[in-house]
């Protein structure tokens, strides 16, 4: 996803890996529910290619159809650099690919 975000933008990368029933909590707002709603929510917001993230923990269920990742992210802009952490819950699709069903995070002090 990092490579896709660097090339196409953060929002486009997330949409490429989002399950149709995705839930995306938003700071100070109700969560956005559904891939189409998420695409609409982001349609008027500026996208960025200057974000990267690195998982530090990943686990999958015994059945192999659900999993999660935890990690850190970094956003570099002209005037500042922001840091944070994230959580993502993944669901295996019928075609064997993984899509995320829940994704959220927050800002943190510099590591």
What do these predicted regions represent?
Residues 9-62:
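A solvent-exposed, acidic/Ser-Thr-rich amphipathic alpha-helical stretch
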Residues 83-108:
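Short beta-strand edge/turn micro-motifs at domain boundaries
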Residues 42, 55-59, 72-75, 85-92:
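Hydrophobic/aromatic beta-strand elements that line small-molecule binding cavities or substrate pockets
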Residues 47-49, 75-81:
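Short, cysteine-centered beta-strand-loop-beta hairpins and adjacent loop/turn segments enriched
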